[in-house]
């Protein structure tokens, strides 16, 4: 029997914190339609992701994937930095 390949969940968001060692906080924003009024409303969630090389900084646009739990609240890992933040 061949094992079925699992689909890996990936999300895209902005880094809002890089103060922890090898960990970033990513803000994921999505739009959902209100069930009664039909207006689109922004919903967001913050996820902790593993950044092995500490390459991300605040404001970077990144892609993360779901992985095994690495800590109590960290079960996502950095895949790619899509866009660097503008340095002032």
UniProtKB/Swiss-Prot annotation:
UniProt-listed GO biological process terms: translation
InterPro entries in UniProt: NA-bd_OB-fold, Ribosomal_uS17, Ribosomal_uS17_bact/chlr
Pfam family, one: Ribosomal_S17
Keywords from the named record: Ribonucleoprotein, Ribosomal protein, RNA-binding, rRNA-binding
Any one cellular-component term (Gene Ontology): cytosolic small ribosomal subunit
Molecular-function annotations in GO: rRNA binding; structural constituent of ribosome
HAMAP family: Ribosomal_uS17_B
Family: Belongs to the universal ribosomal protein uS17 family.
Its job: One of the primary rRNA binding proteins, it binds specifically to the 5'-end of 16S ribosomal RNA.
Subunit text: Part of the 30S ribosomal subunit.
Name used for this protein in its record: Small ribosomal subunit protein uS17
Organism for this UniProt entry: Pseudomonas fluorescens (strain Pf0-1)
The organism's taxonomic lineage, starting at the top: Bacteria, Pseudomonadati, Pseudomonadota, Gammaproteobacteria, Pseudomonadales
Gene of this entry: rpsQ
